[in-house]
């Protein structure tokens, strides 16, 4: 068992699925890790838009959204856990105190309470955000095991990829942070 000081902390990192990813749910994905500790990990897939947009989701939860540029922003598949629950990854809003927010080491926040969506609907919420349904979760040691089996690459997250890069370009953009492209990846791990 490793000592706490020996553990790596992957909070505020991207997980980039390797070509040999066994779980098709995560094939080709980039996951933003919101929390990683000895108890496990929680992240949001940032490159799987659904066919649901903000307007239709807000209608479902009885919120009126009249801000034209926001109406057709896609809602993302955040992962296979709690798929009926919304998770908002966003930049902090000065003076805002949402009911259920978690500050992510590195400057972003993840909020799961409806009040952040109410603020978005009135134009007082975060300007840069990504809304997912569901999240990805790993039990204690599970993510570390997947990484050791060459299932994921990790790299420090860049908010510009989360918020400014088109969804279909996020996988390559995240790989670019490592100086590689998908054409350079192999599903085979080498061990010396």
UniProtKB/Swiss-Prot annotation:
It comes from the Bacteria. GO terms for cellular component: cytosol. InterPro entries: AlgH-like. SUPFAM superfamilies: VC0467-like (SSF143456). Pfam families: DUF179 (PF02622). Transmembrane segments: none annotated. HAMAP family: UPF0301. PANTHER family: UNCHARACTERIZED PROTEIN YQGE, UPF0301 PROTEIN YQGE. Belongs to the UPF0301 (AlgH) family. This is UPF0301 protein BamMC406_0754. It comes from Burkholderia ambifaria (strain MC40-6). The lineage of its organism: Bacteria, Pseudomonadati, Pseudomonadota, Betaproteobacteria, Burkholderiales.
């Amino acid at each position: 068992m490793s000592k706490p000081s020996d553990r790596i902390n992957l909070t505020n990192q991207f997980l980039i699925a390797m070509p040999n990813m066994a779980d098709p749910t995560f094939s080709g994905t980039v996951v933003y890790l919101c929390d990683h500790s000895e108890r496990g990990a929680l992240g949001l897939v940032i490159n799987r838009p659904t066919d649901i947009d903000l307007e239709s989701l807000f209608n479902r939860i009885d919120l009126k959204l009249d801000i034209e540029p926001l109406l057709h922003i896609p809602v993302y598949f955040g992962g296979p856990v709690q798929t009926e629950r919304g998770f908002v990854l966003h930049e902090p809003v000065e003076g805002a105190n949402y009911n259920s927010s978690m500050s992510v080491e590195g400057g972003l926040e993840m909020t799961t309470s409806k009040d952040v969506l109410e603020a978005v609907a009135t134009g007082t919420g975060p300007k840069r955000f990504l809304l997912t349904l569901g999240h990805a979760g790993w039990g204690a040691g599970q993510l570390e095991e997947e990484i050791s089996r060459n299932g994921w690459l990790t790299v420090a997250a860049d908010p510009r990829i989360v918020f400014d890069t088109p969804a279909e370009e996020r996988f390559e953009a995240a790989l670019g942070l490592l100086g590689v492209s998908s054409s350079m990846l192999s599903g085979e791990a080498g061990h010396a």
